[in-house]
Amino acid sequence: MPIAQLYILDGRSNEQKETLIREVSEAMSRSLDAPIERVRVIITEMPKNHFGIGGEPASKLNR
């Protein structure tokens, strides 16, 4: 059972997350020749002040 664990910053809509799950699942199924029903996707959302880019929190970088 292939599992993808994705970390994203807060702020995406449910529709965007559904699209992400669908497209990652399709890509994994295709590239690994695995039935899509066996693919799992886990999304972990983080507050922007919990993620650093270049030594600064993403919240300060307007990301």
UniProtKB/Swiss-Prot annotation:
Keyword Lyase recorded: no
Keyword Isomerase: yes
EC top class named in words: isomerase
Active site: P2 (proton acceptor)
CDD domains in the cross-refs: 4Oxalocrotonate_Tautomerase
Signal peptide: none
Reaction(s) catalysed by this chain's protein: (2Z,4E)-2-hydroxyhexa-2,4-dienedioate = (3E)-2-oxohex-3-enedioate
InterPro entries reported in the protein's UniProt record: 4-OT, 4-OT-like_dom, Tautomerase/MIF_sf
Pathway(s) annotated for this protein in UniProt: Aromatic compound metabolism; salicylate degradation
Keywords: Aromatic hydrocarbons catabolism, Isomerase, Plasmid
GO molecular function annotations of the record: isomerase activity
Entries under Pfam families matching the protein: Tautomerase
Gene3D superfamilies the record matches: Macrophage Migration Inhibitory Factor
Residue ranges of coiled coil: none
E.C. code: 5.3.2.6
UniProt record, GO biological process: salicylic acid catabolic process
SUPFAM superfamilies from the UniProt entry: Tautomerase/MIF (SSF55331)
Record-annotated membrane-spanning stretches: none
Record's subunit section: Homohexamer.
UniProt similarity note: Belongs to the 4-oxalocrotonate tautomerase family.
NCBIfam families cross-referenced by the UniProt entry: PRK02220.1, taut
Function: Catalyzes the ketonization of 2-hydroxymuconate stereoselectively to yield 2-oxo-3-hexenedioate.
Protein known as: 2-hydroxymuconate tautomerase
Organism per entry: Pseudomonas fluorescens
Lineage: Bacteria, Pseudomonadati, Pseudomonadota, Gammaproteobacteria, Pseudomonadales
Gene, per the UniProt record: nahJ
